[in-house]
């Protein structure tokens, strides 16, 4: 995985609570097991007026011209709730998002996000309210999310956030479960050499 230390990007506000995984990526688009190609179906039922995805909904925030290219999603509480599907962070990252900021996340979605190099940032309800107001007042505003120092820089204000130290380490160093295992490759090889022949 790519290393994540700091990200600066355009912010798009999704002012809705309890956004579930079926809204993020509807079930009819889950046939693939690769991580790419899901971005075109992100928030399909909200982004489009037709089932074929040919008629964009002009009222949906992601379809607003000034949010084109957004890479930071600002959301409300309990983001990513509903059924467990890793396709949800796949769709978000494939669309171009690197960070989701919200007061809270569903547990499974939260874990899946780290596994797919999507940074979920938890801030308080009051802080998220401030950020929504800021985005509304300053069209096209960008935030800087500094994972190393655990802070969101928005305009002139800094918002510290907490994150598990192990997950932070993995994202900063671009480590998934395979990468973590390979860090101990020499020890694993040495261990295998010392096992009885009938175990090999």
From Swiss-Prot:
Keyword presence, Plastid: no
Keywords of the record: Amino-acid biosynthesis, Branched-chain amino acid biosynthesis, Leucine biosynthesis, Lyase
EC number: 4.2.1.33
CDD domains on file: IPMI_Swivel (cd01577)
Annotated pathway: Amino-acid biosynthesis; L-leucine biosynthesis; L-leucine from 3-methyl-2-oxobutanoate: step 2/4
Cellular-component GO terms for this entry: 3-isopropylmalate dehydratase complex
A Pfam cross-reference name: Aconitase_C
GO BP terms, alphabetized: L-leucine biosynthetic process
GO molecular function, one term: 3-isopropylmalate dehydratase activity
Catalysis performed (reactions): (2R,3S)-3-isopropylmalate = (2S)-2-isopropylmalate
Class of the enzyme per the UniProt entry, highest EC level: lyase
Record InterPro entries: 3-IsopropMal_deHydase_ssu, Aconitase/3IPM_dehydase_swvl, AconitaseA/IPMdHydase_ssu_swvl, IPMI_Swivel, LeuD
Function: Catalyzes the isomerization between 2-isopropylmalate and 3-isopropylmalate, via the formation of 2-isopropylmaleate.
Assembly, per entry: Heterodimer of LeuC and LeuD.
Protein family membership: Belongs to the LeuD family. LeuD type 1 subfamily.
Protein name: 3-isopropylmalate dehydratase small subunit
């Amino acid at each position: 995985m790519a290393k994540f230390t700091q990200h600066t990007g355009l912010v798009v506000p999704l002012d809705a609570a309890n956004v579930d995984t079926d809204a993020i990526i509807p079930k009819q688009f889950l046939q693939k097991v690769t991580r790419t190609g899901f971005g075109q179906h992100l928030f399909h039922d909200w982004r489009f007026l037709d089932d074929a995805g040919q008629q964009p909904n002009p009222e949906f925030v992601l379809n607003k011209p000034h949010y084109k290219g957004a890479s930071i999603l600002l959301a409300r509480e309990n983001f990513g709730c509903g059924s467990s599907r890793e396709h949800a962070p796949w769709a978000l990252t494939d669309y171009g998002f690197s960070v989701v900021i919200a007061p809270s996340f569903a547990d499974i979605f939260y874990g899946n996000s780290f596994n797919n190099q999507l940074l979920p940032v938890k801030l308080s309800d009051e802080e998220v309210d401030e950020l929504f107001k800021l985005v509304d007042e300053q069209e096209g505003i960008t935030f800087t999310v500094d994972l190393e120092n655990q802070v969101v820089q928005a305009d002139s204000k800094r918002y510290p956030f907490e994150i598990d130290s192990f997950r932070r380490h993995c994202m900063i160093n671009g480590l998934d479960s395979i990468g973590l295992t390979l860090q101990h490759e020499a020890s694993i090889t040495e261990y295998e050499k010392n096992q009885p022949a009938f175990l090999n």
